């Protein structure tokens, strides 16, 4: 659906839904905020029904305000889906990936991208060594000493931390400062060029 303005689509839910029950007419507890995936089961079920029935059920799903609908396994959406997608501003997409594998990958991707996050002042070195403290106390210098001893620099100055599940935090560097470290009296150095990437 190239006519749909994708900049207006907001995805807030990390879970994904396969709307087999909705195509069967059951809309209790339907979470419209989830991305909808169509696999062989849903596709073959729709083939059993006439266009009027498919239009009615699909319109109910699209009207609810779903972010998008993705057809898996190279299944081609009927023109009806494109028409209703344009009408309600819902992107209709397709992938050649198998439904289960795409479901898992999409779910993992959404959990990382939509994870709660904070930015803190400090230096992060591989496997959870977070050095924090007041400005000018030598955090970057301490991190550089660890890098010289084989550790990997993750981020200097600003560390973005995401909580991907109940017991896992992932720290990353903002794109603009990735691979760089600022040392007092020396300036900014490119750690990747000087020490390589492991």
Each language-model region and where it sits:
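Residue-level detector of anion-binding/catalytic polar loops
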Residues: 67, 91, 152
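Gly/Thr-rich phosphate-binding loop signature of adenosyl cofactor/nucleotide-binding cores
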Residues: 1-62
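Glycine-rich phosphate-binding P-loop
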Residues: 127-154
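Extreme N-terminal, non-catalytic leader segments
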Residues: 70-73, 78-127
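Conserved nucleotide-sensing/catalytic segment adjacent to the nucleotide-binding pocket
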Residues: 152-198
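Hydrophobic/aromatic ligand-binding patch that stacks against planar heteroaromatic rings
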Residues: 60, 84, 145-146
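Fold-independent oxyanion-binding glycine-rich loops
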Residues: 39-41, 73-74, 96, 127, ...
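Catalytic-site beta-strand/loop segments enriched in glycine and acidic/polar residues
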Residues: 36-37, 58-73, 118-137
